[in-house]
Amino acid sequence: MDQLGSGHRNVFRDEEPGLTGIGTEPEFAIGQRALLVQTAQGNILWDSISYLDDATIEAVRRLGGISAITISHPHFYSSMVEWARAFDAPVRLHAANRAFVQRPDAAIEYWEGDTLALNSEVTLIRCGGHFPGSTVLHWAAGAGGRGVLLTGDTIYVVSDRRYASFMFSYPNLIPLPGSAIRGIVSAIEPFAFDRLYGGWFERVIRQDAKQAVTRSAQRYIRAIQERPQNT
């Protein structure tokens, strides 16, 4: 952590009322950023970044601290134990990802099933796909009450911000089967959301996000099932 701090700092960006992005500059690891969801029933830290210093701790405390931490999938577990200890907050992970936890700690609490309500505004949804316990977060009060979905890279926002994509392995470009894509879409279907935040700054679908995910899934399934045309 000290070595990382010698050339890096964390930055905070207001994404919308009640939602703050936290990322590291220059980019570290794969450049992901965390999101702090601020609710009257306590703040939820979604996903984790590796670097944590005193300035970051103080800035988060000014925003109301952290009542719980939850992480989309194992690639973002990184320094979750340090974050948990700094804020005396539990880390809630899906039990299907237990085997991927490299640093067991008393702060880690595993949940099972398809959904977990963290409070009246925030619900975790197990989608699977990228990992067996890959999870997204639904924030009902987000986007002015139209609903927000935080997805990490379970649902990956592509460059045009009008579509999303899905992968079993991003570094190796291994796709998911159609059945897994249908499972992801089915898992989020009961939840209303107009905006979607992926795992990186700027990877955001600002409006009509639910429709964007549906048409993205349809496009993806067509692409992996249809025989490509000769060119």
Predicted regions and their residues:
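Active-site-proximal loop/helix segment associated with metal-binding centers of metalloenzymes
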Residues: E25-Q32, A95-A96, V101-A106, E112-D114, ...
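Flexible, charged surface loops at secondary-structure boundaries
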Residues: R13-E16, V37-A40, R61-G64, A143, ...
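Metallo-beta-lactamase
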Residues: L4-G18, G42-L52, E58, S67, V81-P132, I174-F193, ...
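Short, ordered loop/turn segments at secondary-structure junctions
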Residues: P74, A96, F201
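Pre-active-site segment of Zn-dependent metallo-hydrolases
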Residues: E27-A68, D105-A107, E112-D114
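Zn-dependent metallo-beta-lactamase
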Residues: M1-Q41, Q211, N230-T231
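Active-site metal-binding motif and surrounding structural segment of the metallo-beta-lactamase
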Residues: D53-L93
